[in-house]
């Protein structure tokens, strides 16, 4: 048997991406410019949304959405306890109060009954998280916010465009996923995407913010607000300022610096051309995994249901009957066998930052249960079928051996 060294999630970069980046480097325009604008245009077409704002991360996108909505001190924003810190840290960045809700017994989604109970007169935003690219139940989410509409008091111009709690999707994992045929981006009120190096679609670092069509929103005005917040509060971006005779500008608010560059956008343009094929390969790998684990103690999350077609960003599994210690030992044994694996994620209340804010893991038992025996396997387009089969065989064998030895 060959010696394997299977990485967890390397980027899939071809000569197409390299050529696009080289073209940008030769053009003399490497910061925010024509290629960033073209990527925004094409992403809007792909997600079926009015406008897209490309930024330097999904975290920046999520924070700017909250700032555009003027969420701040005295407001509450609800997030699931099972997510990465970025879903929650942005709430503290704007001065609002994070409210965590436990997940359901059989999935990563928020417990919608608990969500309903957590809503108060202070609740301004709910942030559902599309973990692994699997879209949450938006029918239920919108039912909850409609039911609680009477508790909501709009405190800003854009909040008045909704006159209810705003749903802001953390779709860091979900570019290309659909819910009832609708693409991620056009489902929630606002959506943030990640284009980090480990994502299905990458610009090395990067992300975007978008929103679904709403007759109460002037899309050009909304886009302009994001642009201003992303570039120091400046009324002109670099491309506009560089036009002959167009140096004049103003700073209308002491804002931030989180714009995307044309070098990053160049990667994205080439990736978007290849994205349908990349998604198909991920589907083939997930299908192969699913067949291989059928009838074993390895239980993966479902990436395809009656309502959801996932972009299959992560292959999240649970090892039936494994304790935390056994799970960790399985990960070590996989590493010895040349297989990189991961855990998604530590629940927020386990992290020092959120313990210091007063959150207690004991209040979120389902999130802990999800974490306790979870292992994420390699899922990327450079995997061969032979490597997938090796991962299946090794994972099942190692799991059985470790659980048998502890009995």
Where are these regions (language model features)?
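Hydrophobic/aromatic ligand-binding patch that stacks against planar heteroaromatic rings
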Residues: 89-91, 183, 263
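Phosphate-binding glycine-rich loop
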Residues: 29-76, 90-92, 100, 149-153
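PLP-dependent aminotransferase-like
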Residues: 67-171, 178
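Conserved active-site segment immediately N-terminal to the catalytic lysine
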Residues: 155-202, 224, 247-251, 299
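Structural detector of well-ordered beta-strand residues that form the stable sheet scaffold
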Residues: 53, 78, 99, 166-168, ...
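PLP-dependent aminotransferase class I/II
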Residues: 37-41, 49-50, 125-129, 134, ...
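Active-site PLP attachment segment
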Residues: 173, 186-236, 262
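N-terminal "arm"/small-domain region of PLP-dependent enzymes with the aminotransferase-like
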Residues: 1-29, 34, 250-252, 378
């Amino acid at each position: 048997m060959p010696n394997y060294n299977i990485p967890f999630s390397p980027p899939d970069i071809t000569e197409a991406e390299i050529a696009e980046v080289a073209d940008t480097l030769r053009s003399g325009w490497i910061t925010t410019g024509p290629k960033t604008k073209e990527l925004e245009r094409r992403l809007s077409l792909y997600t079926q949304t009015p406008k897209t704002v490309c930024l330097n991360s999904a975290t920046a996108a999520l924070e700017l959405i909250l700032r555009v909505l003027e969420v701040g001190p005295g407001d509450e924003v609800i997030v699931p306890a099972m997510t990465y810190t970025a879903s929650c840290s942005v709430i503290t960045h704007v001065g609002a109060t994070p409210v965590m809700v436990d997940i359901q017994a059989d999935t990563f989604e928020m417990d919608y009954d608990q969500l309903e109970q957590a809503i108060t007169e202070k609740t301004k935003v709910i942030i559902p998280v599309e973990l692994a690219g699997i879209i949450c139940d938006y029918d239920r989410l919108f039912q909850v916010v409609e039911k609680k509409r009477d508790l909501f008091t709009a405190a800003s111009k854009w909040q008045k465009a909704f006159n209810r709690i705003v749903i802001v999707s953390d779709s860091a994992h979900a570019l290309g996923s659909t819910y009832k045929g609708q693409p991620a981006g056009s489902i929630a009120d606002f959506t943030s995407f990640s284009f980090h190096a480990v994502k299905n679609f990458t610009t090395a670092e990067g992300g975007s913010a978008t929103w679904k069509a709403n007759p109460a929103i002037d899309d050009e005005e909304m886009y302009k607000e994001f642009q201003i917040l992303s570039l120091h509060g400046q009324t002109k971006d670099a491309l506009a300022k560089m036009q002959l005779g167009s140096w004049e500008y103003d700073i209308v608010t002491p804002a931030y610096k989180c714009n995307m560059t044309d070098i990053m956008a160049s990667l994205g343009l080439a990736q978007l051309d290849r994205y349908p094929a990349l998604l198909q390969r991920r589907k083939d790998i997930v299908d192969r995994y699913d067949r291989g684990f059928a009838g074993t103690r390895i239980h993966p999350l479902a990436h395809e249901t009656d309502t959801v077609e996932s972009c299959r960003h992560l292959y999240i599994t649970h090892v039936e009957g494994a304790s935390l210690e056994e799970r960790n030992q399985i990960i070590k044994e996989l590493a010895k066998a040349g297989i990189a694996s991961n855990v998604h994620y530590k629940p927020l209340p386990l992290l020092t930052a959120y313990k210091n804010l007063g959150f207690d893991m004991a209040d979120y038992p389902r999130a802990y249960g999800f974490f306790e025996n979870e292992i994420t396997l390699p899922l990327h387009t450079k995997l061969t079928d032979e490597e997938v089969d090796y991962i299946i065989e090794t994972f099942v064998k190692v799991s059985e051996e470790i659980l048998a030895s502890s009995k």
